[in-house]
């Protein structure tokens, strides 16, 4: 069992590297200005705007992101890696539970989308709606990715039932530590930083449901 666990974890790490799994993320109350983002990227850190909108799909919630190009890239099991306008990429378990396949039409926020890809992303290996959740239910929550133009159209349509979430993901690239980035953020935008999730502990907890010490015990054994 331990050998199988190590193989799965190794495969997960390899996939995470290929698809640029985030080193961490931070949320803000107000989007950063271009100059504030530049203050971070000039230090050698890669930053990606990863805002999202939540929509009702019957009893379920579908969280929509703009398709990613730098961090936490979509890994298709079927179909496309990036959507064209009018297309959507869906997390595979949500698609399965809702019997959605390539070429199907899905209506989100009053707009019709063609399902062009089905797969996963490193930050949603387990699709928890909130980091505090302890169970995954793909009947009730999933994620999708659309073009920048379609994302803006959905936002303008106003049918999202929660306000837009302002999250940024980052890759440190060896330029600084998580703590140094956190301090830089707090200096750059007083009272604006809502949350900072540092990857070393939080990512494991969010994506496995196991505390870090249990993960370490599994590796040691």
Predicted segments, located by residue:
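Membrane transport/envelope proteins' first extracytoplasmic loop
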Residues: 1-221
């Amino acid at each position: 069992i331990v050998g199988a666990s190590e193989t799965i974890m190794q495969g997960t790490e390899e996939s995470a590297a290929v698809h640029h799994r985030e080193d961490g993320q931070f949320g803000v109350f107000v989007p950063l200005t271009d100059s504030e983002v530049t203050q971070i990227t000039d230090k050698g850190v890669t930053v990606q705007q990863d805002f999202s909108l939540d929509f009702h799909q019957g009893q379920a919630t579908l969280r929509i992101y703009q398709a990613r190009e730098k961090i936490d890239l979509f890994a298709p099991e079927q179909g496309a890696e990036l959507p064209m306008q009018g297309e959507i990429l869906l997390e595979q378990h949500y698609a399965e539970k809702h019997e959605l396949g390539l070429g199907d039409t899905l209506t989100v926020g009053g707009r019709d989308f063609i399902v062009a890809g089905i797969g996963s992303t490193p930050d949603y290996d387990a699709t928890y709606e909130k980091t505090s959740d302890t169970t995954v239910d793909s009947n009730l929550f999933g994620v999708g990715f659309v073009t920048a133009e379609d994302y803006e159209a959905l936002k303008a349509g106003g049918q999202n039932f929660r306000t837009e979430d302002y999250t940024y993901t980052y890759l440190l690239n060896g330029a600084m530590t998580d703590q140094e980035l956190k301090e830089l953020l707090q200096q750059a935008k007083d009272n604006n930083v809502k949350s900072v999730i540092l990857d070393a502990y939080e990512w494991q907890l969010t994506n496995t449901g196991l505390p870090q010490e249990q993960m370490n015990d599994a590796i040691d054994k």
